[in-house]
């Protein structure tokens, strides 16, 4: 999930300012709603996870990531700032929906000191994937010409990564179900 979210945090503002001509302030105001939704989703994610488990959270979060990736394919130079705000909101809620439950699931099988070490490893992997996401997104954007088709290429990358993560996670959850 960090392979997508942090890359979008780099590309969407570049698109908004450089290609659409909106100011930094306009973009900042447009993202407030998504940020507030993200907080609400993060606060409720733990309770939902406790009641329903990882599967519904995973389906919802992955579905939101796929939706925001497809929405990115419809960006144009005339895209209204409201559409950009909605894309950001989908991405923010998707991130919040998946972040806490995946962390809990990743660390739930560990005991004592293993949990501390597991948390450190998990956080390190998140930081690495965040850096990789930013680098890959900007690399694709730059190599494709820093124009509208480059933005579409980045969102195709996001969609492919979302599908790959969904498939790998589904296989993992299926194998966990067989073991447990």
Regions found by a protein language model. Give the residues of each.
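12-transmembrane solute porter fold
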Residues: 1-177
């Amino acid at each position: 999930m960090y392979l997508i979210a942090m890359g979008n945090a780099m590309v969407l503002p570049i698109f908004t300012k450089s290609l659409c001509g909106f100011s930094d302030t306009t973009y900042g105001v447009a993202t407030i709603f998504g940020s507030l939704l993200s907080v609400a989703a993060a606060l409720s994610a733990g309770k939902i996870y406790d009641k329903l488990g990882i599967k519904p959270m995973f389906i919802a979060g992955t579905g939101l990531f796929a939706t925001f990736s497809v929405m990115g394919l419809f960006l144009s130079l005339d895209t209204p700032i409201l559409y950009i705000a909605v894309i950001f909101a989908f991405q923010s809620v998707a991130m919040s929906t998946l972040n806490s439950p995946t962390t809990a699931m990743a660390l739930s099988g560990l005991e004592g000191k293993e949990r501390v070490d597991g948390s450190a490893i998990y956080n390190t992997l998140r930081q690495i994937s965040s850096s990789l996401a930013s680098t890959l997104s900007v690399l694709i954007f730059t190599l494709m010409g820093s124009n509208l088709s480059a933005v579409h290429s980045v969102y195709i990358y996001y969609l492919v990564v979302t599908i790959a993560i969904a498939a790998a996670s589904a296989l993992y959850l299926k194998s966990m179900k067989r073991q447990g």
